[in-house]
Amino acid sequence: MTDAKGPPPPETRGPATVGAWLALPRGGYYVRTSAGPIQIGIPPETIKDVMELKLDVPIAYVLPRDLFDRRRGLSVAEFEFPAYYSFFLLKRRCRLVVLAPDVERRVRAIFQESLFGPTGEPLATEFADGYPEARRPRFQRESEYFRTVPGRGRIEADDLVEFIQVKGGSAEIVPGITIVDQGDALVIRDNGKDIAVVGATVSLPSRTSSTDPDVSPASWVAPSFGVTVLGASHGFDPSGKTTGFLLWMGGRAILVDPPTDTTDYLRARGIAPKTIDGVILTHCHADHDAGTFQKLLEESQISLYTTPHILGSFLRKYSALSGLSEDLLRRTFSFHPVRIGAPVHVRGGELWFKYTLHSIPTIGFDAFYGNRSISISGDTLYDPKRVTEMFEQGILDPARFEDLIGFPGHHSAILHEAGIPPLHTPVAALAELPDDVKKRLYLVHIAAKDVPTDNGLRAAREGIEHTIRVEPSAAPRFADAIELLDIFAMVDFLRDLPLSRARSLLQVARRMTLPAGEHIVTQGTKGDSFYIIVNGTVQVVKDGIPIKRYRAGDYFGEMAILLDSPRNADVVAKSDVDLVALDRNDFLASLRGSEMLTRLERLVAVRNEGAWELLAQNTVLAHLTSAQKTQLQTYLVPCQGGPNEVLWRAGDIPKKAYLVDDAVVTLRCPEGELKPFTSGAFVGEVDALRSTGPSPSSARVTQTGKLFSIDRPDLVRFFEDNPGVYLSFLGTRFVE
C-alpha cells in the first residue's frame, strides 16, 4: 500500500516490463532499438555490466522518475562514468534523457561537484595554525589544468553530456527513436512501433551473498594495525571492485572510500557493522563516494572524516541526487572535520591528512599506531615530470611543488594509486622508485592485469584473507582501556555511560576467547554474567531449536540477570568468538539507579511480551539488524488500547507512535479513512513527531487489544542513531 504517505513496498519495480529489453545485473533496463541500445536507470558501476556482458554501449541513458533508491541507499542516476566512458574512450557525448526540467538542473549541480569540484578555496581554518600558506593547494588553478584537454580546450558539462528533455509526454532520442512518459511507465517507440514498456521508477535488485552471512572465518583475527583492501581497481574494470579499504586501528576499523554494498560483503565474512565506527571520504567522484553515502545510511550513525571543503561538495551533490535537504543529510552522520597539518586522534593512533593533486579536492593520509605507519595516497598524480611542468607553468607554488614531488617511501606499508593517466599516477613513475620502497608498496586503483610483472611492482590483493598486517612492537598508551571503552560504546544502553560508571566497568570487565561449538550459556542454569560480543557469531538455541544469531556489538545474558531467573536458552559459539563478560553483581552495581538500567528492564519486559516476533511481521522493521531491533525494543512500552480510544488527533502535536499487536487501529487523514491496521503495523505521524508540528491525521483504536507505544523523544533518538531507518520512515504515517 503506497497511498496516504505509506512507504513503497521493498521490491516495487513498476508495472510489468515487456518488449525487447534486458534486466542488467546491477539494475536498470537495457532496451535494444534499431538505432542502438537505450538504458533506463544508471546504478553505480553500470558500465561494467555492459562490458561484462559484451553489450554495445548505450546511445542514450534515461534517468528514472526517482534518482535515488532509498531501500538500497544507492543512486539510480550515476551518469559520471558513462559520461567519462563516452567522452574519453568513444569520443562522443553521452545522451541523458530527463523526464523534467528540474532533473536537468539537479544533474548539472551534481556534475559541478564531481567533474569540476566546488567553487572557491578552502577556508584558512581547514589548516593547522602555522601551516604555511605556500603549501596550501590553489584548487582553481589546479582544476583548470585538469579540465583543459589538448586539442579541445576547456571542458564544460555540455561537452560531455547532451540533455534531452521529455516535453508534452514524449521526446525524440535520435531520429526514429522516441520515449513516451505514461506516468508510472516509459514506452520506447522504434519508428512508430512500441518495442518496450518499462517502469518509470527503477528499483535496484536485492543484495546477494554467496557466503553464509553469520559465519566468520574461524582462523581470521583483526589486526591491531593494518589494512584490508576491499577493492583495488577502478570504475572501468569489469572484473574488479573500486578502490576502498578498511583501516584497522586498535582492533576496530575505519572505512576508506568503501565500494558499494561493503556492509554486506563484510557481514558475509563475519565482520559486523558495529566493528566499524568511521568512514574517511577522500573526494566526490562516484567510484569513491557512492559506497560512502550508502554506508552513512546503514545501521547506526557513524563518524565521517573529511575536510569541510569536501564535505560541502558531498552534501550538495547528494542533496541534488536524493532530493533530500543538505540539513537532513547532515544529520545522518557525526562529522569529524580534519585539519591539514594537525593530527586526528583515533584509538591511540594518529591520522595526518594532506590534499593531493587531483581534478577535484582530494585527501590522502598517513596513519600512525605505536611505532608503525601506513600511507594511503588517495587519488593523486605522482609524476615528477608532469608535476615539474605544472610548477614551471606557475600552477603550483614552490612549497606545494616540493610536497607533491616527494614520495612517502619511509612508511611501514604504502598503498598508492596507479590509475589511468592523465588524472592518475602512471605506473612508470612508480617503477622508478628504489627496490626497498617497492617491497612495502601495494598498487591500487589499477586492474591487476595492468600491473607489469618485471619491475618489482605488485597489485594489492582484495579480501580479508589478504589483510596487510603492520603490527607494532609497542602499543599506544592506554590501548587496552580505549579498546574496552569502544566495546562498551557498541552497546546502545551503555554508550552514554557517565565517566564514573564507565570506570567501574573497566575495573570488572573480563575478556574471553572461546572456540566454535563452545557452550557459553546453558538453558536452565543460573544467570551469573552479561556478555558483549567483540568478534564472531553466536547461536541462540531454545529447547533444541535455533532461534536467532548475534554478532559483534550484540549482547546477551541480561534477562536472566535482571529477572534473577534461570537461562531460558542455550547460547553456542557459531564461530570462534571474543567476548567481554561482566559478572551479575558488578553489572547491576554499575548500572543501579541509571537510565540505562531502566531501559534494560524495559527491554526484558518487552521481549517477554513478544515484541521481537512482532517486528518480523513489518516489511521495514523485519530487515533491521538484531542490534537495531534490540535498541528499538528498549523504547517500546506495552499498553492496552481501549474501545474507540483516540491515539492522536488532527491538529494536535503527537506525543507517541505505536506498534500494533492484536488491536486494530484506523487512521483518518486528508485523503480519507484508511483500511484498518493490524498486527505488525507501525502507525505514527513521523514528520510531525520529528518536527513537533501538528498532525494532519487522527488515529483511534477500533478493536480493543494490545499495542506498544514509543514516546516522541525515544523515537527521535532511535532515528538519529539509525539514519537509514529514518529515511525509510520519512514522510510516512504508517509502515506495514
Q: Which ranges hold each PLM region?
A:
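Cap/insert and terminal regions of metallo-dependent hydrolase folds
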Residues: T2-G151, D383-E471
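Short beta-strand scaffold segments in enzyme catalytic cores
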Residues: G28-R32, L186, T243-L247, P361-A367
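Metallo-beta-lactamase
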Residues: R138-V174, I179, T211-P213, P308-T362, ...
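Non-catalytic propeptide/linker segments at domain boundaries
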Residues: Y145-F146, G153-D237, K241-G244, M249-I254
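Active-site metal-binding loops of divalent metal-dependent hydrolases
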Residues: L230-H234, P258-D261, C284, T356-H358, ...
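Di-metal (Zn2+ and/or Mg2+/Mn2+) metal-binding site signature of metallo-dependent hydrolases
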Residues: A272-E299
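Catalytic core of the metallo-beta-lactamase
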Residues: V338-G394
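Cytosolic regulatory regions built on CNB/CRP/Popeye-like sensor folds
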Residues: I468-E736
